[in-house]
Amino acid sequence: MVRVPGFSFVQPVVWLSFGSVQIHLFDRVDAVPTYQHVGLEVDDFESVYRAVRQRQLLDKTFGHYCYELPDGSVQLYFRDPAGNLIEVDWPDVRNLDRKVISDIRLLSEDIPQVPGVDASLFLNR
């Protein structure tokens, strides 16, 4: 396992990689958090977005439900019907139809980022 550069978030986080897999470890000292989640890459981000929005499952645990990260990747957060927090990832915001998804917020607008960090949500791309 190797530590890799990561973006800044509200709480301290360490990004680790092993092979083509990443794990992000958050450091919290307060009560059991409600932000524990699984992150998934999908083949059709826009279809997932439409389905989640239609079912009113979008979740603002992290301040907003759809963020563009500094590397151009996108994260969408929602709760499944059982209440589990799900993160859906997309590698390139430029490949999304902004008429379908018009509410993507820049992470850097909410959380200042460290300039020059060579981080990527997607490894080897």
What is each stretch, according to the model?
Residues 1-22:
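Core segments of cupin and vicinal oxygen chelate
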Residues 8-12, 32, 69-74:
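Short acidic/glycine-enriched loop/turn segments that link adjacent beta-strands
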Residues 19-22, 30-32, 43-48:
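Short, charged/polar surface micro-motifs in flexible loops or helix N-caps
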Residues 24-26, 87:
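Conserved beta-strand in the GNAT
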Residues 33-37:
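Short, solvent-exposed beta-strand edge segments and adjacent coil->beta transition regions
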Residues 38-85, 93-96, 111-125:
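Vicinal oxygen chelate
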Residues 100-109:
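Short, compositionally biased
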